[in-house]
Design a protein with these regions (language model features):
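C-terminal motif of bacterial Sec signal peptides marking the signal peptidase cleavage site
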Residues: 16-19
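Functional surface patches built around histidine and acidic residues
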Residues: 2-3, 21-156
Length: 156
């Protein structure tokens, strides 16, 4: 049963990540969901944190790691750190209570941000850190160097 679950999860992840390509035609089967491909580089954009954590969980499943649960407190921490990052342009320091913190800047969508993390060896290891809860946030500052700043925090 575990092999079937892993195969299904890997298939879902492959389909989801296929949507990270630059294809700009009409929606097709397997296209990335709007919540993952919505541009965050505009005022009042709203991140679908459940879908974002779902994509991270699909990746974790391919590495035999348990899923993360979205946590309101960690979302608040992530938002405070993302806002600080967007205002100062300086990467925030990981609070000691966190298991892991991943940062990114400049990517307009979560799909692109996730692909950047997944394709960087150190960030990919961080995505599968032994944690049980997650918070994710994005902040937009059009006058800053990168415009958009992402923070993922993992905890227990």
């Amino acid at each position: 049963m575990n092999k079937i679950h892993a195969l299904l999860t890997a298939s879902f992840l492959a389909i989801a990540l296929a949507g990270c390509s630059s294809f700009s035609g009409p929606a097709s089967p397997g296209a990335l969901s709007a919540g993952l491909s919505a541009r965050m580089d505009q005022p009042n954009a709203t991140l679908d944190s459940q879908q974002a954590i779902g994509l991270i969980n699909a990746y974790r499943a391919t590495r035999n790691m348990p899923p993360l649960v979205a946590d309101a407190g960690l979302n608040g921490t992530a938002q405070a750190l993302a806002s600080q990052y967007a205002q100062t342009g300086t990467a925030p320091t990981k609070p000691q209570a966190l298991v892991q913190m991943k940062l990114s800047a400049g990517y307009p969508t979560f799909a692109e941000t996730f692909s950047g993390w997944r394709n960087n060896a150190a960030d990919a290891v961080g995505l599968v850190a032994p944690a049980s809860k997650a918070g994710i946030a994005v902040a937009y500052n059009p006058t800053s160097s990168y415009g958009i700043y992402w923070v993922l925090v993992l905890g227990n």
